[in-house]
């Protein structure tokens, strides 16, 4: 892809910086090198996880699979084996959809967990857990706290928009449509019940 592993690692570090991962530095492609120059933080892992599921949401289709029978085909024939997900939250935490477990002797047991409830998707990132059970327990605690503080307000009743008048156009006016439904997530534990709606536009009444 990049010609050499080092060139690819350089791209990785550039991309990490673009995502705001200020406390991350890669030294290889696999992430298994036990070096003081190879580091990251739970916050940065959460940023990377968010980018992944935002740009490629289909990854959750695969990371949410608990167990799957795989057929390995070679020239000598085929064999079957069962692949089991290492993310135990898939079976124990409601709404869990992934995402990635990992461990090394330095990083200990790590997890980036993704869960969705009531239209809200949260990410819990855990690092340096002493054992697998602790990483899953801590991730569940973080997710529970997040869901207890977050409430989704979704406005389905969109008011009709007035057409936009045109100047020197092929038509006198064109219809306007909403880019999408209005969504707001309260993160302080309160429910956004009393919401006042106001339509605002950043363009003139007459478009050129």
Q: For the regions a protein language model found, what residue spans apply to each?
A:
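N-terminal pre-first-transmembrane soluble regions of secretory-pathway and organelle membrane proteins
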Residues: 6, 13, 29-30, 42, ...
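Conserved short loop/turn motifs at secondary-structure junctions
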Residues: 1, 30-35
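Alpha-helical scaffold elements that line and support the substrate/ligand-binding pocket
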Residues: 1-12, 45-48, 124
